């Protein structure tokens, strides 16, 4: 079905196509025709962060920034959906055009800039959702006009608002599209921010009588020394999990493409190797008590298996859906199932 719709979507501006695709998924959900888009995979229960995921394949943050399509997206067969990034106050993001497809590379460049309706609007949408069939992650960030020295207050405010509703919360400090945000990954800044948020997490757990896991999403552009420093901080502060990785600002694999000079984060197939290297290094540096979600460049079931072999407990897709459609979800679940049943058949050589 998606193969028929893709030419129409690709004839449109990327951001308009994004909106049309979401409306179409919603329509299919409301009319009971989601099965025409994808077949829900047989469950593959997977534990992580003290939660049990129906299957290990999730939707990465960014597709549904405001939590307006949760039920329709879960119906596609995802084991979990991550919404956001959301900020305390609504903001428009960066000027358009700000999203570009690179079909030759099965890639996307975006510089959206945390465009969203604000955390209060997201909370209202989540409260209306039925949330059947999978778990919900909520990805939080800071407003672009909030200085880094005051970033903790933005993250804390969002955490307080979404804590009663989220199955897990992701702290996004790795988007390349908010000026200065990635500086929060520097060792001392990271330690201050995550220490404060861990205290907030524990206080909210006592207040609400439940512990919601807190994950941290990191960039693929960290060098080995920075990865090791981040791993030390995250292990010291006992975060619940790490998502590796966000998009990249580097362009080595698409250097000759006319759009390579566009500012923003590159995602899709060219990110697979780089993001998986970071994932593998983090797995080697972090205790097994801190599970990892592998994201970046998953365009096939084999790519999902490569993430698992590199140390991921769960995986997320986003740009791959642009090129493969919802069938990618079941393909990834089934590939991971085969690896789980016969681990040697799913092994991959070191990157």
Curated annotation (Swiss-Prot):
Binds 1 FMN per subunit. It is a peripheral membrane protein. GO terms for cellular component: cytoplasm; plasma membrane. PROSITE patterns: DHODEHASE_1 (PS00911), DHODEHASE_2 (PS00912). Its main location: membrane. GO terms for biological process: 'de novo' pyrimidine nucleobase biosynthetic process; 'de novo' UMP biosynthetic process. It catalyses: (S)-dihydroorotate + a quinone = orotate + a quinol. Pathway: Pyrimidine metabolism; UMP biosynthesis via de novo pathway; orotate from (S)-dihydroorotate (quinone route): step 1/1. GO terms for molecular function: dihydroorotate dehydrogenase (quinone) activity. FMN binds at residues 61-65, 85, 139, 172, 217, 245, 268, 297, 318-319. Keywords: Cell membrane, Flavoprotein, FMN, Membrane, Oxidoreductase, Pyrimidine biosynthesis. Catalyzes the conversion of dihydroorotate to orotate with quinone as electron acceptor. NCBIfam families: PRK05286.1-1 (NF003644), PRK05286.1-2 (NF003645), PRK05286.1-4 (NF003646), PRK05286.2-5 (NF003652), pyrD_sub2 (TIGR01036). Monomer. This is Dihydroorotate dehydrogenase (quinone). It comes from Xanthomonas oryzae pv. oryzae (strain PXO99A). The gene is pyrD.
């Amino acid at each position: 079905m998606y193969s028929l719709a893709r030419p129409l979507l690709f004839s449109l501006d990327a951001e308009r196509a994004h909106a049309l695709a979401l409306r179409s998924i919603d329509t299919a959900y409301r009319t009971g025709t989601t099965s025409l888009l994808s077949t829900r995979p047989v469950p593959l229960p997977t534990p992580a962060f003290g939660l049990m995921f129906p299957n290990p394949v999730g939707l990465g943050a960014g597709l549904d920034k405001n939590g307006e399509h949760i039920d329709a997206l879960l119906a596609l067969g995802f084991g979990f959906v991550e919404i956001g990034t959301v900020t305390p106050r609504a903001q428009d993001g960066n000027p358009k055009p700000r999203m570009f497809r690179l079909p030759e590379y099965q890639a996307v460049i975006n510089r959206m800039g945390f465009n969203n309706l604000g955390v209060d609007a997201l909370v209202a949408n989540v409260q209306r959702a039925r949330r059947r069939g999978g778990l919900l992650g909520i990805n939080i960030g800071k407003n672009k006009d909030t200085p880094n020295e005051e970033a903790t207050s933005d993250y804390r405010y969002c955490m307080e608002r979404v804590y009663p509703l989220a199955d897990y919360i992701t702290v996004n400090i790795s988007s390349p599209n908010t000026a200065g945000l990635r500086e929060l990954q520097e060792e001392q800044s990271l330690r201050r921010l995550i220490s404060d948020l861990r205290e907030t997490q524990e206080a909210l757990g006592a207040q609400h009588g439940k512990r919601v896991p807190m994950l941290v999403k990191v960039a693929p552009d960290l060098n080995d020394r920075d990865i090791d420093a981040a791993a030390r901080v995250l292990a010291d502060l006992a975060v619940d999990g790490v998502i590796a990785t966000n998009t990249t600002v580097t362009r080595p694999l698409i250097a000759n493409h006319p759009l390579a000079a566009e500012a923003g984060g590159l995602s899709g197939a060219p990110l697979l190797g780089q993001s998986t290297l970071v994932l593998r290094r983090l797995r080697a540096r972090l205790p097994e008590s801190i599970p990892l979600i592998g994201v970046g460049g998953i365009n096939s079931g084999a790519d999902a298996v490569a993430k698992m072999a590199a140390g991921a407990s769960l995986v997320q897709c986003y740009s791959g859906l642009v090129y493969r459609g919802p069938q990618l979800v079941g393909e990834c679940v089934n590939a991971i199932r085969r690896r789980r049943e016969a681990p040697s058949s799913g092994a991959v050589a070191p990157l």
